Amino acid sequence: MAEDEPDAKSPKTGGRAPPGGAEAGEPTTLLQRLRGTISKAVQNKVEGILQDVQKFSDNDKLYLYLQLPSGPTTGDKSSEPSTLSNEEYMYAYRWIRNHLEEHTDTCLPKQSVYDAYRKYCESLACCRPLSTANFGKIIREIFPDIKARRLGGRGQSKYCYSGIRRKTLVSMPPLPGLDLKGSESPEMGPEVTPAPRDELVEAACALTCDWAERILKRSFSSIVEVARFLLQQHLISARSAHAHVLKAMGLAEEDEHAPRERSSKPKNGLENPEGGAHKKPERLAQPPKDLEARTGAGPLARGERKKSVVESSAPGANNLQVNALVARLPLLLPRAPRSLIPPIPVSPPILAPRLSSGALKVATLPLSSRAGAPPAAVPIINMILPTVPALPGPGPGPGRAPPGGLTQPRGTENREVGIGGDQGPHDKGVKRTAEVPVSEASGQAPPAKAAKQDIEDTASDAKRKRGRPRKKSGGSGERNSTPLKSAAAMESAQSSRLPWETWGSGGEGNSAGGAERPGPMGEAEKGAVLAQGQGDGTVSKGGRGPGSQHTKEAEDKIPLVPSKVSVIKGSRSQKEAFPLAKGEVDTAPQGNKDLKEHVLQSSLSQEHKDPKATPP
């Protein structure tokens, strides 16, 4: 029987020999893993034993094989918790140290402690939880004084750990990375993994700064400077939470960078244009951010105010284009208090009247300053002035302002005015006749010659005929009104749009009190042409009826002037009519005499300018 056993087991030995040689000659991956878990001394012993076994015969090898111990050895139990070579053991060890502590008067249920550990492993999703037996072994190694107790009633009893409790303040353990399996030592994993992330962030910041320097033409040392520059230049919104955090946390860092910016400022030659801004930094009118971004305020002002604009203005000095732009801009002076600002001398306001759209024209009229003096050519500027309130006159009634702006008192003593004060302004260059009757030139017919005008009017009505006017001598006492009618027919279109103002005396009983005359508007010297068309249809404001009769008297008033229609350009301005309205008026005889002389001179001097009006 004893011999049969070796024979029966001899195939095993024969079958085992080739794998043994294969293990020695061709190590497999299993051998490599086992060598990694065995110490060097054990490996040396195994190699010595193998050398001795190779000298054995087959029977000796079989005997050695049968004598080898079977089952797990006791050395495995001691090596598993102590060595902590497995990742699961390491996570369990860390969790117990971070969440549990010794306390003699406290008991914790075993199942609740294990459930908390299992949830922790599930949250990591990178390790498997240990079994309850292995977890209990690790707890006993960490806390050797704990005892296992069974607490609770019959059927509801639970096993508890007596002598430990949960920590009230749990510190957050360093979480491992996702690539811990590649590292040989699991403890170094959480410390090594942040390094690649930091390098990645630094590389990204460097690339962003390089891109910002090329785009913005400025130099930036960090990504923080880029963000501050974007905020100060209003390129992004400054109302976000990140913008407020950046402004609040960057004040201390800006003060440290101030000396470096002071040394870089003089190289760009910006101290001269900024000299005015350094003198009074505390009285700057604009906010510091906007002012320094535009003018590049100096480092002295930054050091005093300690605002968050240090880094933005310093890179701006490196750009030549920005420097040229700043040099062209006007210097921004500080705002002084209102009490210290000297009052600016202001000239008294000039009340210029609102002028109408009429063109300004200059004409030369022969005028006589005194009765009997030769007429002199005086240039007159025609302007249209606004309505002026009535000026108090020496007459009994208040003055009324005609549309042209002149104020003419209605008193009896001021009714007769000379030729210089009755010619209205020339409104838009309309031609007018030079033969002006006395009733229109002086404003009203003189009371002394009302009877004479009635006699001449009766005689002229009897001799009025149609056709061309006949040439008469200058000394005849009669005149034909036919030229006046033809002139009125030619200028009827223009006379229809000329404003007229008629006024008469308020309550006087003489024959001239109710006379109707046109106001001194532009074309007041149209003469009998416009007076004839306006006299019949216009009702006097004073309510007098004889206005049309005096208009007809004015048509036949001038016997010494030949019947010609001659025109002149321009008219008297209202500037010369104002003194006449205030009281500087001539007497009636002097006004009639000046009128006759003026009409004669103007007719003779302007005769060659109107060939159409010359009779054949």
From Swiss-Prot:
Function: Activates transcription from class II MHC promoters. Recognizes X-boxes. Mediates cooperative binding between RFX and NF-Y. RFX binds the X1 box of MHC-II promoters.
Gene (name only): RFX5
Sequence ranges of Basic residues compositional bias: 463-473
Name of this chain's protein: DNA-binding protein RFX5
GO cellular component: chromatin; intracellular membrane-bounded organelle; nucleoplasm; nucleus; RNA polymerase II transcription regulator complex
Annotated localization: Nucleus
Motif (PxLPxI/L motif): 173-178
Entry's free-text remark on domains: The N-terminus is required for dimer formation, association with RFXANK and RFXAP, assembly of the RFX complex, and for binding of this complex to its X box target site in the MHC-II promoter. The C-terminus mediates cooperative binding between the RFX complex and NF-Y. The PxLPxI/L motif mediates interaction with ankyrin repeats of RFXANK.
Top-rank taxon: Eukaryota
PTM-bearing positions, type N-acetylalanine: A2
Organism: Homo sapiens
